[in-house]
Design a protein with these regions (language model features):
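N-terminal Rossmann-like NAD(P) cofactor-binding module of classical short-chain dehydrogenase/reductase
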Residues: 1
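Class I S-adenosyl-L-methionine
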Residues: 6-160
Length: 160
């Protein structure tokens, strides 16, 4: 599995791309290369792989994703009384929020079955709490949803 930094790739940060391009003309190409390294290693060793990134320019710099998901689609893998262990004041119980995320995968990676939970219509209201540049905010925005992580583990583990 690979989780390349989305800072230079995610379209949610497009307002900052021009400023970043002035500092480093190749910043997005270099960011996309980190994904390609993970892909090349998986290909070299013939192992299943999964690369996760939000909706981003990676789709045009490399290739289209193999799948997409929203966290709430896998919230059913978490207990009914679930609260996030570190950020329960921000992340909804059972990952009950939308955030389209892209997955590039191959070499036998098994896509997990969805187990959706109810979610409010529209945009995630936790986005209101996740603006800014603090380290905590950046960490929270970059976390892989726990329900999806568990679903991937169960789908791809031969020991379960």
């Amino acid at each position: 599995m690979a989780f390349p930094p989305c800072t230079d790739l995610a379209v949610s940060g497009a307002a900052h791309f021009e400023r970043k391009r002035l500092a480093n003309q190749n910043f997005q190409i270099e960011a996309a290369e980190t994904c390609k390294v993970a892909f090349k290693l998986a290909e070299k060793y013939g192992v299943p792989y999964m690369i996760e990134n939000p909706v981003s320019v990676l789709s045009s710099l490399w290739r289209k994703p193999d799948n997409t998901f929203h966290p709430y689609e896998y919230g059913g893998y978490l207990p009914e009384d679930d609260l996030h262990p570190f950020f329960s004041d921000i992340i909804k119980p059972r990952d009950a929020y939308p955030k389209k995320t892209c997955i590039w995968s191959g070499n036998g990676f098994k896509w997990p079955h969805a187990s959706p939970v109810d979610v409010n219509d529209g945009y995630s209201d936790q986005n209101k709490k996740l603006g800014g540049k603090s380290k905590k905010t950046k960490v929270i925005r970059s976390l892989t949803p726990r329900g999806f992580a568990r679903a991937v583990f169960l789908a791809n583990s031969t020991n379960c």
